[in-house]
A protein has these predicted regions:
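Alpha-helical transition-metal enzyme core signature, strongest for iron centers
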Residues: 6, 70, 101-105
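N-terminal alpha-helical segment
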Residues: 42, 59-60, 77, 94
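Short, structured motif recognition centered on aromatic/hydrophobic residues
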Residues: 60-68, 98
Length: 130
């Protein structure tokens, strides 16, 4: 395995998820079925894709949160809302990202995203948004 890629993957993961990473349940599930494939996905997604510099990590996380909210993928959304806040996304802007979904993903998706967002903010001691 390329040591530079492995190092970049770990550094990016630490920025997104903090030390003592709580991996997404989907990653753990993949790992149960095929450890090598799960690791390859991790290297590609975190080490290569998330390490690109065209978008900042906060911008990437806002995109990820919007997509996950539209898909109503709440477990992954919870993980990426935390990551967004970890890399400096403004909570008011992230709320606005979720409001914008109403037109394209519908109110149920917005409501679900806001519930996840509020729960994460409460867990972090950052609720209500100031």
């Amino acid at each position: 395995m390329d040591d530079d890629l492995k190092k970049k993957t770990q550094e990016t993961a630490n920025r997104l998820f903090g030390k003592g990473i709580k991996m997404a349940p989907s990653y753990l599930t993949w790992k149960e079925f095929d450890r090598d494939l799960a690791n390859e996905f991790s290297l590609f997604i975190t080490g290569r894709l998330y390490s690109r510099t065209v978008l900042t990590l906060p911008e990437r996380q806002m995109v990820a949160c919007a997509m996950l909210a539209a898909l109503r993928a709440t477990d992954e959304l919870r993980l990426h809302v935390n990551a967004a806040l970890n890399v400096g996304c403004d909570a008011k802007k992230l709320a606005e990202v979720f409001f914008q979904l109403a037109t394209y993903a519908g109110m149920p998706a917005v409501n679900e995203a806001l519930h996840v967002f509020r729960d994460v903010l409460k867990e972090r001691g950052e609720w209500p948004i100031k």
